[in-house]
């Protein structure tokens, strides 16, 4: 699968005018496969950054590198993934992303210092694998639109946070599979 990941990124860069030639790259990681920390997106972005550096003189933006990753997931692997994981890996840090125009998402950094709040990010290997969740991932955009509709909007970006919070009980009642 990793070889295919590299081939499809190369194809995307060829389509953007890259004159690719041989290249030796060695990568090591101890991130468990399927651990849910976007390791696939990080690998896709790594390949994009390497190709961009070596063959495109860094002309491809971090946003475009993320979009290449999404395109490859959709086209070559048949995974209806969005752009969030690739964008977070490519742009880096904590960001907000507005997908009002999917071809040109608005990306803004969020300034936060977890240590000042006495917090730390810990990653644990739960042993769970999310590799077979394609249908669940594909359902997320429709579920978000359903929540927005309950809150009086078409998409969640149009719903003020206060309205969203105020409508949580209605969302749970109308949209939950299990009513409590």
Predicted regions and their residues:
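Gly/Ser-rich oxyanion-binding loop with an adjacent helix/lid
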Residues: 3, 7-116
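C-terminal nucleotide
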Residues: 1, 96-178
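Short, intrinsically disordered or compositionally biased N-terminal tails of bacterial proteins
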Residues: 5, 179-180
């Amino acid at each position: 699968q990793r070889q295919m990941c590299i081939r499809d990124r190369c194809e995307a860069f060829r389509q953007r005018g890259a004159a690719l030639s041989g290249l030796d790259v060695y990568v090591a990681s101890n991130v468990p496969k399927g651990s849910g920390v976007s390791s696939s997106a990080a690998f896709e972005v790594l390949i994009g950054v390497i190709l961009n550096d070596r063959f495109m003189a860094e002309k491809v933006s971090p946003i475009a590198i993320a979009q290449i990753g999404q395109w490859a997931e959709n086209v070559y692997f048949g995974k209806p993934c969005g752009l969030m994981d690739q964008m977070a890996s490519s742009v880096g840090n904590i960001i907000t992303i507005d997908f009002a125009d999917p071809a040109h998402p608005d990306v803004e950094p969020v300034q936060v210092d977890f240590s000042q709040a006495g917090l730390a990010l810990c990653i644990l290997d739960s042993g769970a694998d999310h590799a077979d969740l394609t249908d669940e991932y594909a359902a997320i955009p429709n579920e978000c639109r359903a929540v927005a509709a309950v809150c009086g909007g078409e998409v969640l970006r149009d719903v003020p946070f206060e309205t969203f919070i105020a409508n949580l009980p209605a969302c749970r009642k109308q949209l939950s599979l299990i009513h409590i």
